[in-house]
């Protein structure tokens, strides 16, 4: 099994910050966060050949992503992944250093880049 952090698409004309907050709430019910950092750069990955045409209805070959570092300021009781269109089957807090090894291999480089930035904000 592989893990990933919440993520999602941006609606037409939707500001990136609003998209991040909307996706976070849609996927986890989390509303209470403090934004610490919007990544300056976009992060990208390509799907491996064996997945091209098999996921995302065959429309895409990869993704370009804008990431945010946020601090959860709510109570754990507000976290609910059993949402209308549930995308996760489980959640947990982990040591951030484990992130790159828990994600699917083709996203590992992105998670390594995220970890570099994240370490600047976490004691």
What are these regions (language model features)?
Residues 96-123:
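Charged phosphate-binding loop/patch that engages nucleotide di/tri-phosphates or the phosphate backbone
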Residues 10-105:
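Unchanged
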Residues 1-5, 17:
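N-terminal strand-loop-strand
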């Amino acid at each position: 099994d592989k893990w990933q952090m919440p993520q999602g698409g941006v609606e037409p004309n939707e500001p990136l910050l609003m998209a991040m907050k909307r996706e976070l709430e849609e996927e986890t019910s989390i509303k209470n966060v403090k934004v610490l950092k919007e990544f300056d750069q976009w992060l990208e990955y390509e799907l491996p050949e064996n997945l091209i045409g098999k996921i995302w209805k065959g429309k895409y070959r990869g993704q370009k992503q804008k990431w945010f570092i946020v601090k959860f300021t709510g109570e754990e009781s507000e976290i609910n992944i059993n949402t209308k269109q549930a995308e996760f089957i489980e959640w947990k807090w982990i040591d951030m250093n484990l992130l790159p090894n828990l994600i699917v291999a083709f996203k590992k480089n992105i998670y390594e880049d995220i970890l570099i930035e994240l370490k600047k904000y976490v004691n």
